[in-house]
Amino acid sequence: MGQIVTFFQEVPHVIEEVMNIVLIALSILAILKGLYNVATCGLIGLVTFLLLSGRSCSLIYKGTYELQTLELNMETLNMTMPLSCTKNNSHHYIRVGNETGLELTLTNTSILNHKFCNLSDAHKRNLYDHSLMSIISTFHLSIPNFNQYEAMSCDFNGGKITVQYNLSHSFAVDAAGHCGTLANGVLQTFMRMAWGGSYIALDSGRGNWDCIMTSYQYLIIQNTTWDDHCQFSRPSPIGYLGLLSQRTRDIYISRRLLGTFTWTLSDSEGNETPGGYCLTRWMLIEAELKCFGNTAVAKCNEKHDEEFCDMLRLFDFNKQAIRRLKTEAQMSIQLINKAVNALINDQLIMKNHLRDIMGIPYCNYSRYWYLNHTSTGKTSLPRCWLISNGSYLNETKFSDDIEQQADNMITEMLQKEYIDRQGKTPLGLVDLFVFSTSFYLISIFLHLVKIPTHRHIVGKPCPKPHRLNHMGICSCGLYKQPGVPVRWKR
């Protein structure tokens, strides 16, 4: 009985000790909450702004940018798409697979004496290689206004493909008006087919980009075994793919497809790769491995307006097709014929082809440059290194593009850092304990006052992460118009 009485006598003391501990804990929590309110009320932000005002808004990200390059090895795409290249002034090649291909020869010697092409009979007797013939068909159907059938001869004896186009003119009137003749149309199509390689035997006429001149009288297309034919230029699929996507009867479908469906870069399991994309040794020339972060890959998956993104799609398509479909040459050609509009931007290819003909620096889809931020390790989306007069431009020729790319990288990093900072909510559990202390009341007062921390241009949204001075300009160069009205905001 005495023990029970003693226990109840001690209960008030126990409660008092517990209350003291609770009060101490609540006081600590209230002080922490007060510190948090002071940190978020704008006072510290105001002091920071005043200290940083007038300095570059990208100071924390300023560092050393390295200009780096990569060169793609497109020879590895030969199993799923035709590759074009050049051996010398008159011999050009289309590679299909590892053992076969087509030879496109500019010559003054005719090898076919007749002026007809019995294609239906050859097809009925299955005389030719269908994968090679589909490439020739694409070439022939791309010739504009082909209406002089005597200008074309073909022969399929023993399965050997021989197609001959007559580039000479029978009449002086045709020679004088070459630019509108069938011969010019054949040469135009040949230039587009061989583009990405070289067509050094041709002259664009200099005064008119769509008028192609040559001293040769015949263009002969024959099947051939594959050897080391690519001596003058590296193999590239861009010429054939551009020709394929630009076929007149497919233009409307092409435009619709570009707006509704594109190839999405994927990982080894076929899933989208938000974490980045790596080019391995077999995709590159004289390099081991190049990886690009999720920012670059996300841009490629969202947009269809960069040459580098087109090449990533081609490499990814090639990898998936070889592993999943294990297609033969004929099936591969059929597949790329159907998929081309989803893989590449035909307008980009045509633009670069026209720039080449007109003597303007153009992209040959082979070499690219990008910036590497040394302190963060982040890289920009590679951009094509343009070519002029047969050689790559000097860095000084596109220094403005390099500077703009650096500014874009800084802006993207600042925006990402700001979004991450806004998404954090420190001390969320403290909001459960709202008790009044003197410090807490002061912090509440400061929080309600909402001390302004930065300037806004009147009538425009928040400029963060950029910092404006009293003239309404930012030292990083984005806001360039001085004297605009500004006001302070929290």
Curated annotation (Swiss-Prot):
Belongs to the arenaviridae GPC protein family. A lipid is attached at G2 (N-myristoyl glycine). Keywords: Disulfide bond, Fusion of virus membrane with host endosomal membrane, Fusion of virus membrane with host membrane, Glycoprotein, Host cell membrane, Host endoplasmic reticulum, Host Golgi apparatus, Host membrane, Host-virus interaction, Lipoprotein, Membrane, Metal-binding, Myristate, Transmembrane, Transmembrane helix, Viral attachment to host cell, Viral envelope protein, Viral penetration into host cytoplasm, Virion, Virus endocytosis by host, Virus entry into host cell, Zinc. Zn(2+) 2 binds at H454, H456, C462. Residues 34-58, 453-490 are cytoplasmic. InterPro entries: Arena_glycoprot, Arena_glycoprot_zinc-bd. The record marks S58, L59, L258, G259 as: Cleavage. Gene3D superfamilies: 6.10.140.1590, Arenavirus glycoprotein, zinc binding domain. GO terms for cellular component: host cell endoplasmic reticulum membrane; host cell Golgi membrane; host cell plasma membrane; membrane; viral envelope; virion membrane. One of its GO terms (biological process) is virion attachment to host cell. Zn(2+) 1 binds at C57, H466, C474, C476. Pfam families: Arena_glycoprot. The keyword Glycoprotein applies. Residues 2-17, 59-431 are extracellular. Disulfide bonds join C85-C230, C117-C154, C179-C211, C278-C291, C300-C309, C363-C384. This is Pre-glycoprotein polyprotein GP complex. The gene is GPC. The chain crosses the membrane at residues 18-33, 432-452. Glycans are attached at N78, N88, N98, N108, N118, N166, N223, N364, N372, N389, N394. GO terms for molecular function: metal ion binding. The record marks K33 as: Important for GP-C-mediated membrane fusion.
